[in-house]
Amino acid sequence: SAPVKKSPTGLQDLKITLKSGQAEVDWMIFDAKPWTAGGMQTGKYRNLLAKLGYQQANIDAKLNDVFNALFYGPNKVYFEVGDDMGYISDIKNNDVRTEGMSYGMMIAVQLDKKDIFDRLWRWAVKYMQHQEGTHEGYFAWSCKIDGTRNSQGPASDGELYYVTSLIFASNRWGNDTGINYLAEAQRILN
């Protein structure tokens, strides 16, 4: 097929032709012009799906469906441990990684799921975060699902997402509800 010379605008159908029994969409691109001021400055967060023509009720329903599938469905990646912890499993590798944990926290804070956010954070601190030594404040990037570390070394993308999600949590829920999110973010940054 010929390359696309100009990106289509508006609501578009995505067509996938299967040559085998499954399909994976690795990434999608949206050609949207950047705002001159971000959401923190304007108080408005850009909704690219709405810009593409989707109705807000349909967007909300789809996000809810995806969240429920990932966190509660038969193929879920979120698992609760005891009364106050949880982890995100890398199903393919049967382990827990900082990227997955911090992405799960970002999803939780964006969707106002404080209990899930706090559970993930508690698991990460207990099993992944170095409490002393040269990596103090950073996280072992991979653990078994029982919390045993597969590697001691940190992976910076996980740390960056932890910090970002903790700052978002501080803004959304404050710092006096059992976890001082801002202090936790600052500890990682220090």
What is each model feature region?
Residues 104, 116-117, 178, 185:
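Solenoid-repeat scaffolds in large eukaryotic assemblies
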Residues 1-34:
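Extracytoplasmic
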Residues 18-20, 111, 166:
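Short beta-strand segments enriched in hydrophobic/aromatic residues
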Residues 34-99, 110-145, 149:
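Low-complexity, Ser/Thr/Pro/Gly-enriched N-terminal "stalk/linker" regions
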Residues 92-103, 112, 153-164:
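Aromatic- and histidine-enriched alpha-helix N-cap/loop-to-helix transition segments
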Residues 73, 126-190:
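Extended ligand-binding groove/face enriched in aromatic
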Residues 12, 26, 102-105, 160:
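Residue-level detector of short, conserved catalytic/binding motifs and their immediate flanks
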